[in-house]
Amino acid sequence: MNGKFDKYEYLQDLMRRRGFAWGSFEIYGGSRGFYDYGPLGATIKRKIERKIREAFIREGFFEIETPDITPEQVFIASGHVEKFVDPVVECKKCGMRFRADHLIEEFLGIDVEGKSAEEMSRIIREHGLKCPECGGELSDVFYFNLMFETYIGPYKDKKAYLRPETAQGIFVNFKRLNAFARNKLPFGVFQIGKAYRNEISPRQGMIRLREFTQAEAEIFFNPNETEHPHFNEVKHEKLKLYPIENQLKELGEVEVTAEEAVKRGYVMNSFFAYYMVMIKKILLDIGIPEDKIRFRQQLPEERAHYSADTWDAEVYSERFGWVECVGLAYRTDYDLSRHMKMSGADLTVMIHYDKPKVVKRIQVSLNMKKVGPKLKADAKKINEIIKSMDQKELEKLVKDLNEKGKVTIEGYELSKEDFIVKEVEEKITGEKIVPHVLEPSFGIDRPFYLLLENSLTVDEDGRIYLKIKKDMAPIEVAVLPLVAKEPLTTIAYEIYRTLQKEGFIVVYDEKDSIGKRYMRYDEIGTPYCVTVDNQTPEDGTVTIRDRDTREQIRVKIEELPRKLKELIFG
């Protein structure tokens, strides 16, 4: 193989030609940001989802399924209507739109992460940046919401969106899920499904899609109890980390154990480190090489509006560099608190103490004798507002009265003398809290592509094949008669049917020479070819050919299912 071999271009051709994946709507010219999975690709995708699902279930997480279409008020509460936006410029000549930050970084080499629309507009003007399609003048930068908008039913007032993440379907069901978990923290809930983001100018093939599959888990926990109960089981596992400080100083990654990651303060607690290890193990189980995996901490300006800290599990691509495949976001109580406020639902959990506690509380009420004549009918309303305040709000009210001498409620200016403030002691057996959330969020499409890219192998003799993890292969076994003649074909077909019944993904193929057939199945990653040759009718044995080594062993036909299970699944 010469030095001009382009792995990306070869892989794109292979995916289209052999039934892995290709751009959607081809006969109508295609549409960027959409991909179809062919028979082989759909099988691998299903296996990736299964690996993630099995890992989540082993952790004791509950699986649910919720709608893709979501009413607008859910995303108003979650902040997506206001904040799920990207900066855009439009060509005044041809009308094409582009991500402003990507355009500036690609053509000017200027990092504009965290810059405002006004600042990016100024950079475009000062450097004379033009439309890359036609050379026309670009507009000022404006923001574009990435959610696909729709309506529920025929009424325009029933606005809805295709969900940009699966997470909100879990949060709005928290009350029922908490009851299912018997009000005991921590617990995890996950779902696997489609998400949609109306990307402005998606490029990079399957790396940036408008419709994609996610596997997201929301782990609800008490923020006062951040030690994972099973951390000792994983504390010696190695993690390659790229924290913010190292990024800013260009120091590169550090490799530490999960325990060291917590002790050195790279991650905030053992909950974080535990799920980093879980994510790494899932990626390894899918077949991503360990040396191609790292965890990069997002810079503050990169984080989503709901995140207090996020680490991305990235996988290295020869074509695209480090690619985010899994996010691990600390969402705090952001989502549940917002949905409580918007919906009025109680999304708290009662935490019971081992022993009752005596606590001091502030009680505040209106001095009705003093303010009654002034407030008249509104006095009762204002008193109810005060009663609805929690301790933090009452403490702030008292602090404002002490410092400023007055506060304003419902348009009425009230002085310190208008209130009765008492400090009382109460014996309590527990407290209500809003749980915090840690979210491992897997994309499925990116790991799919990166698994194929990292599996594509070129031997010294020029053989090109997918060295995919054996249990991830889309076809696990190919049964091949040496030549298309009796009795070899009948014996081979009977073996094929037996392996089907044993649960293997298996094909029967008698077309072309045996060498061409070996190449055909090597190329798509089939780990083993079973060959029925002239010796088979004599002694009831067949050969099993290994994809990677090309070595062959002979086994009895009756031993074939057991041997293949051992070779493929261990």
From Swiss-Prot:
One of its GO terms (biological process) is glycyl-tRNA aminoacylation. Keywords: Aminoacyl-tRNA synthetase, ATP-binding, Cytoplasm, Ligase, Nucleotide-binding, Protein biosynthesis. GO terms for cellular component: cytoplasm. It comes from the Archaea. GO terms for molecular function: ATP binding; glycine-tRNA ligase activity; protein dimerization activity. It catalyses: tRNA(Gly) + glycine + ATP = glycyl-tRNA(Gly) + AMP + diphosphate. Substrate binds at residues 99, 165, 212-216, 439-443. Its EC number is 6.1.1.14. ATP binds at residues 197-199, 207-212, 324-325, 443-446. The keyword ATP-binding applies. It is found in: Cytoplasm. Catalyzes the attachment of glycine to tRNA(Gly). Belongs to the class-II aminoacyl-tRNA synthetase family. This is Glycine--tRNA ligase. It comes from Pyrococcus horikoshii (strain ATCC 700860 / DSM 12428 / JCM 9974 / NBRC 100139 / OT-3). The gene is glyS.
